[in-house]
Amino acid sequence: MAEGYLQGPVLVIGTGLLGTSAALGLRAAGIEVGLRDASPTAQRIAVDMGAGFLAPHGTDFAPSLVIVATPPDVTPGIIAQALAEFPDAVVIDLASVKGSIIDALKADDDVAEADLARYVGCHPMAGREKSGPAAARGALFTASPWVVVPHEGSTSHAVKTAKSVGLDLGASITVMDAETHDAAVALISHFPQIASSLLASRLLNAPASSLALAGNGLRDTTRIAASDPRLWIQILAHNAQQLIPILEGLQSDLDRLLATLRDPFASGAALDLAELMTEGNQGQARIPGKHGAPPQSFATVSVIVNDEPGQVARLLTDMGEAGINMEDLRMEHSSGYEVGLVEIQVLPGRRDELVSVLTGLDWKVVQ
C-alpha cells in the first residue's frame, strides 16, 4: 500500500467531533466508511451529514482499518474489542494521550501480542471548542500535525496505514514515541487548557461592568475555556504525571511573582518583573510561524469597518486587488458602537503600501 492512499473499507467507532470529521474527510477521498457509536443520536447525525453508513455489531462488514475515536477512559477497551472482532484490520485511535492507553492494552491478558501488533496510536492536533458530530468538518485536519505513535511491537504495515490516514486527510505526519508525545501535548495543549480554564474561572463573580470592557486579549486567552469538561477531566487524569512538573514550575513562578508584587517598589522588584515578562517574550517567540516556518514578525494595520454585511470581504478584496497578502487577521467589536476594528497583519515591507492603498479607497485606517 502506498503512503497516502488508504484502502477501505474503514470503520469509525465514535462519531463525535474527531470521528465524524475523519469519516467525512475519508468519504470525500472516495473511501467507504462505516460508523458505530454508543449514542444512537450521534450515529444518526453523522449518517445524516454524509459521514458513512451504520455498521452495528453482527453485520457482515470487514474493514481493513478501524479508527477508534472515543474518550480516553473507554479507548483501551474498545481497541481490544476491535482487535478481536476484526482479526485482519489495523486499529488506530485518536485519543490525545498515548502512554496510558498502550499500558492498559499491554496489561490486558485478552489482547494477544500478535493482535497488539496491528495497533498504532494516532493523535490529530486539530479540534474545536465545540464537540459532537454536528461540529465536525471534513477539512478539520488539513495542514495540521498528525502524530503517529507506534509501540515497539507495531508492524510496519500498521504504521504505514496510520500514516496514510493522516495523509489522505491532508495532515502533516510526525512520528513520536508515547512518552515524548505525552510530554509534548502536556505542555502545548493540556497545560494551556488548564491555564485558560483557571483564568476564565476568575470571571465568575466579576461585575458585568468590568466584563463589558473586555477586548481580544481576554477573549483570546479564554477561548479554549469553553471546551467540554467531561472530555478534559479524562485527558488531564490520563496525562497527570506529565502535567505535574509543568504546574509545579508555574507554581514556582507565581510564588516569585506574588513575592515581588507584595513590595513592587523594593530594590530589585522592577528587574524581577522585567525578567518574568522577558521570559514570556522569549517563550512566545519560539512558537513556529505559519506552516511550521520559523517565527516571523509582521506589521499590523488597523482599519475601522462598519458592522454591516460584506465589509470585511470588501476590505480583503481591495487588499487582493492591490497584490498584498494578508498574513493574519483579528477583529474586535467596539462596545456600544456599530463598528469593528480589523487588525490586518502583513509583511513589514508592505505596511506603508497597504496604508496608502486603503486610505486612497476611503477606508478608515487607524494611524
Model-based region annotation:
Residues P9, E32-G34, R118, P145, ...:
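Residues at the starts of beta-strands that form the adenosine-phosphate
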Residues S39, L140-A226:
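Internal alpha-helical scaffold of NAD(P)-dependent oxidoreductase catalytic cores
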Residues A208-N281, F298-T300:
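Interdomain hinge/lid region at the active-site interface
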Residues A38, T70, L94-S96:
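Short beta->alpha hinge that forms the Motif I/post-I loop of the SAM-binding pocket
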Residues V66-I67, I92:
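N-terminal Rossmann-like NAD(P) cofactor-binding module of classical short-chain dehydrogenase/reductase
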Residues M1-G58, L65:
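NAD(P)+-binding Rossmann beta1-loop-alpha1 motif at the extreme N-terminus of oxidoreductases
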Residues I78-A134:
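Rossmann-like NAD(P)(H) cofactor-binding subdomain of soluble oxidoreductases
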Residues G283-Q367:
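A conserved regulatory-domain signal marking ACT and ACT-like small-molecule sensing domains
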